[in-house]
């Protein structure tokens, strides 16, 4: 069975990635620390990450960046649909994107995002596709899908 997990390299240039990382680090007033503590086979794990909701306020400094990312994501979605043989019957006629978020995971810390479910009730049952854009190639950084035993290295 197709997992529908698809990797595209060089969606953003190195300069664009550096730009987003630098802007994230400077926009400390928009940083939110997310508590991701959870139980695992080893017991309770304290976990966090730092994120920015790029449309956190009407006067956000990220508005033009969001427009650029929305266009970039739209192009990726069209390629994704083609490469995964998605037919019109498998894709909604109308959909929208959630406000993009940037998440930072620091190496050698408790930063992580454990396996989870995004849909908890009727109100949140809108998400059907997730897109990750890795902005650096941190050694050891990856996304792991435990139920499929698939690991995607950041690059």
Sequence positions of predicted segments:
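Fe(II)/2-oxoglutarate oxygenase catalytic core
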Residues: 1-155
């Amino acid at each position: 069975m197709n997992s529908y997990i698809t990797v595209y390299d060089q969606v953003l240039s190195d300069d664009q990635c550096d730009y987003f990382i630098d802007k994230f680090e400077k926009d400390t007033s928009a940083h939110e620390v997310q508590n991701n503590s959870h139980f695992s086979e080893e017991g309770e794990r304290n976990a966090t990450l730092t994120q920015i909701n790029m449309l956190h306020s009407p006067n956000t400094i990220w508005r033009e960046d969001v427009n650029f990312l929305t266009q970039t994501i739209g192009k990726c979605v069209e390629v994704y649909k083609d490469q995964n043989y998605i037919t019109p019957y498998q894709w909604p006629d109308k959909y929208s994107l959630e406000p993009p978020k940037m998440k930072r995971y620091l190496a050698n810390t408790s930063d992580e995002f454990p396996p989870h479910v995004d849909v908890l009730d009727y109100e949140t049952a809108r998400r059907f596709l997730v897109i990750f854009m890795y902005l650096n190639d941190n050694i050891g950084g990856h996304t792991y899908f435990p139920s499929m035993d698939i690991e995607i290295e950041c690059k």
